[in-house]
Amino acid sequence: MAKQLSIPSATSGSKSHSLAWRPYYEMTKPKVVALMLLTVLVGMCLAVPGSVPLQPLVIGMIGIGMMAGAAAAFNHLIDRKIDGLMARTYNRPLPKGRVSIPKALTFAISLAALGFVLLYTLVNELTAWLTFASLIGYALVYTAYLKRATPQNIVVGGLAGAMPPLLGWTSVTGEFHGHALLLVIIIFAWTPPHFWALAIHRKAEYAKVDIPMLPVTHGTEFTKTCILLYTVLLAIACLLPVLVGMCGPVYLVGSTLLSCGFIYKAWELKFDDKPGLAMQVFRFSIYHLMLLFLVLLVDHYLWV
């Protein structure tokens, strides 16, 4: 019997080629970037009383999104060894060998460079440099140093992740404004309880790879207390836009309800021993931030 030759079909080759981009897309953390871009968009909209000019809106979103994706890719590169040891991240492209280190590095640098050039040439220099500073803050200061150096890593490093509303604001106006900084303060206060809830759930994994997250170094109960205190601090921060006349009653009602919900979930985490509460707090925090900025947007166009 003659041997049968296995010849790859054009269809299978095309399918394989079409899937080649997926690991690179995954390295940009698209869900995280999408939430971040929502806060950028709100920053843009709140910067002007009417409609946002088209060029800074479109190019700004693309450029900031590209540099945020690049920062995420650098995070994948720097954390590739510990990612391979953690259940949450072991299936990422680099630990699994779906992308080589040189290709991942080339991708991250190219994405960052293109995003920077777009912002610098078609938006404004201030936004380009602020976005670059955010990339350095997240990829190098937080991921490469703070994450491994101190249990306060996410508190200090959270500033880089809190910058997007300011980036959106400067994309449109080309200058700093106190109102934009209030939005930064909100995300800065939101970040620790968001990440600490996840860290409680993944405490054993962080301990395994010697990452000094707060639950690992100070214990779960102490971390739960900190989460509760930070949700109260966040609730106060969320009132600041109302106190300075930046927002109206729609935002006041919406933000108050969201703050009460977050405090309740944190209280439940602290004083209830039901399993799975940490991940409930983590998931609620994502919806909290998303809905809070949507309420900001609605209030702006109803109250302006």
UniProtKB/Swiss-Prot annotation:
Pfam families: UbiA
PROSITE patterns: UBIA
GO BP field: heme O biosynthetic process
Any one cellular-component term (Gene Ontology): plasma membrane
Catalytic activity: heme b + (2E,6E)-farnesyl diphosphate + H2O = Fe(II)-heme o + diphosphate
Pathway the protein acts in: Porphyrin-containing compound metabolism; heme O biosynthesis; heme O from protoheme: step 1/1
Primary location class: membrane
UniProt GO molecular function: protoheme IX farnesyltransferase activity
Entry keywords, A to Z: Cell inner membrane, Cell membrane, Heme biosynthesis, Membrane, Transferase, Transmembrane, Transmembrane helix
Keyword Hydrolase found: no
Family as reported in the entry's similarity comment: Belongs to the UbiA prenyltransferase family. Protoheme IX farnesyltransferase subfamily.
Extra facts: Carbon 2 of the heme B porphyrin ring is defined according to the Fischer nomenclature.
HAMAP family: CyoE_CtaB
Name the record gives this protein: Protoheme IX farnesyltransferase
Annotated source species: Shewanella sediminis (strain HAW-EB3)
Gene name, Swiss-Prot/TrEMBL: cyoE
